[in-house]
């Protein structure tokens, strides 16, 4: 087979070889059926590159105009779903270039002057990922807003706070929800910080060493909205640390969603019954008619494992690669794409689901009345009366053990009984008639009246501050 015949096979590099690539290898190495989602960003980058080439006198202005005309038609075909993607053309870049050349002739062949697919794909990914980060930050904002609204509605609602899944102290449900707002706020900050490193232009690095053409990289960066250019051509084409950093931030987003999901599943359980989730976010059973299953939070837990796996996959992908570009890097896209899709879908669903959560304050309060949730308040009461904390801790532990045997709560004991079971001896008189005020749930949460505390007034203040941050 002649080299001219090989060139007709479609590979941009086929003139170098004496036999065509096997069909199996074509399928194995092709990326077009997943990287075609970069198409509009590929066009965007190519238009900026063409404008720079014309500005620098590397191609004629007439060629640039033809390239723009052809790209406009290709974009319309892609958006209409009429673009024909060909496996023989390997990837998104060569498919678009081949179509451009078919439309505008030699002008299309001149577009690739001064660049390589190595810096081209790195640019496409950064353009695409920058756009997706912006979208994720909007979705994080929507979820945070929904959590703040639900927290405000429940600033006075009391439920048991847990450590080790054992009743610890009373907290307000609003305070509990604000904890997740803090997590998602940090997630948004991490995304914004990650975006800074994504927003650097690789184009101009060419294959690995730069190009001999008199290009203007800063012009292209400005055209594409990048903050600047990648400063080393080898690094620009070969590293994917920006994608790894994004996946790490995304894994934390999903980890926080997963923690919230676990609590939603627990709270919705009939044995707990703190909340109900709207029917449109649940499924039933094909055999058990009574079932209402919290599939959305359960799936979010499961999908978190997949996103975490993508992070490890990308780290493993990069760990053994020498400089510069290697074909291994083609494997960066599918995990990155799936990570974005999973995070976007999850955040969109949760932002819609949270406002529809039905809170059951009576069930929460009943649970908070079990497990001696105000035991720490009794110890603090004794400390304020002058008892050392360790002695107070021991006295309350004696009282709790007595309540266990009597099957009652601390608040059910009279002052005389509290004195008797405390083991304080002549110091038992420190327990006065005012003791029961600190053993109420309302008294307990109201006492934590400081920044970061669970008191309703602090919860409302924290919500107001969080909204300023969100809207600022």
Swiss-Prot record:
PROSITE patterns in the cross-refs: FUMARATE_LYASES
Gene3D superfamilies with a match to the protein in the record: Fumarase/aspartase (C-terminal domain), Fumarase/aspartase (Central domain), Fumarase/aspartase (N-terminal domain)
The protein's Enzyme Commission number: 4.3.2.1
UniProt keywords, alphabetically: Amino-acid biosynthesis, Arginine biosynthesis, Cytoplasm, Lyase
GO biological process: arginine biosynthetic process via ornithine; L-arginine biosynthetic process
InterPro entries, sorted: Arg_succ_lyase_C (IPR029419), Argininosuccinate_lyase (IPR009049), Fumarase/histidase_N (IPR024083), Fumarate_lyase_CS (IPR020557), Fumarate_lyase_fam (IPR000362), Fumarate_lyase_N (IPR022761), L-Aspartase-like (IPR008948)
Metabolic or biological pathway: Amino-acid biosynthesis; L-arginine biosynthesis; L-arginine from L-ornithine and carbamoyl phosphate: step 3/3
Keyword Methyltransferase: no
Family affiliation: Belongs to the lyase 1 family. Argininosuccinate lyase subfamily.
Record-given protein name: Argininosuccinate lyase
Native organism: Cupriavidus necator (strain ATCC 17699 / DSM 428 / KCTC 22496 / NCIMB 10442 / H16 / Stanier 337) (Ralstonia eutropha)
């Amino acid at each position: 087979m002649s080299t001219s015949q090989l060139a007709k096979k479609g590979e941009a590099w086929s003139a170098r070889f004496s036999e065509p690539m096997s069909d199996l290898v074509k399928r194995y190495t092709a990326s077009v059926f997943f990287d075609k989602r970069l198409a509009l960003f590929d066009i965007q980058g190519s238009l900026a590159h063409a404008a720079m080439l014309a500005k620098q006198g590397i191609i004629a202005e007439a060629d640039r105009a033809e390239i723009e005309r052809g790209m406009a038609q290709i974009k319309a075909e892609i958006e209409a779903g009429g673009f024909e993607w060909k496996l023989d053309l390997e990837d998104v870049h060569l498919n678009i270039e081949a179509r451009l050349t078919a439309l505008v002739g030699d002008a299309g062949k001149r577009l690739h002057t001064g660049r390589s697919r190595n810096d081209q794909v790195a640019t496409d990914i950064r353009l695409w990922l920058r756009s997706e980060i912006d979208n994720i930050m909007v979705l994080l904002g929507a979820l945070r807003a929904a959590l703040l609204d639900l927290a405000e509605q429940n600033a006075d609602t009391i439920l048991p706070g847990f450590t080790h899944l054992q009743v610890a102290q009373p907290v307000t449900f609003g305070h509990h929800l604000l904890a997740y707002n803090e997590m998602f706020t940090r997630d948004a900050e991490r995304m914004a910080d990650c975006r800074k490193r994504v927003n650097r232009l690789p184009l101009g690095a060419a294959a690995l060493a730069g190009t001999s053409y008199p290009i203007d990289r800063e012009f292209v960066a400005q055209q594409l909205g990048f903050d600047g250019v990648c400063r080393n051509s080898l690094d620009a084409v070969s590293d994917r640390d920006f994608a790894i950093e994004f996946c790490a931030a995304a894994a934390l987003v999903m980890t926080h969603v997963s923690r919230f999901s676990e609590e939603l599943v627990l709270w919705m359980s009939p044995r707990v019954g703190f909340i109900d989730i709207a029917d449109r976010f649940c499924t039933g059973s094909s055999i058990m008619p009574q079932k209402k299953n919290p599939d959305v939070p359960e799936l979010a837990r499961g999908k978190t494992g997949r996103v975490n796996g993508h992070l490890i996959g990308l780290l493993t992908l990069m760990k053994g690669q020498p400089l510069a570009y290697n074909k291994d890097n083609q494997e960066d896209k599918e995990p990155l794409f799936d990570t974005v899709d999973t995070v976007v879908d999850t955040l969109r669903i949760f932002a819609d689901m949270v406002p529809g959560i039905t809170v059951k304050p009576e069930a929460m309060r009943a649970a908070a009345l079990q497990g001696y949730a105000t035991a720490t308040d009794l110890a603090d009461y004794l400390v304020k009366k002058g008892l050392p904390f360790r002695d107070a801790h021991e006295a309350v532990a004696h009282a709790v053990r007595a309540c266990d045997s009597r099957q009652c709560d601390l608040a059910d004991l009279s002052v005389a009984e509290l004195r008797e079971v405390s083991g304080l001896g002549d110091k038992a008189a420190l327990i006065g008639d005012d003791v029961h005020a600190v053993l109420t749930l309302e008294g307990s949460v109201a006492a934590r009246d400081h920044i970061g505390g669970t008191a309703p007034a602090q919860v409302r203040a924290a919500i107001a501050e969080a909204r300023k941050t969100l809207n600022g």
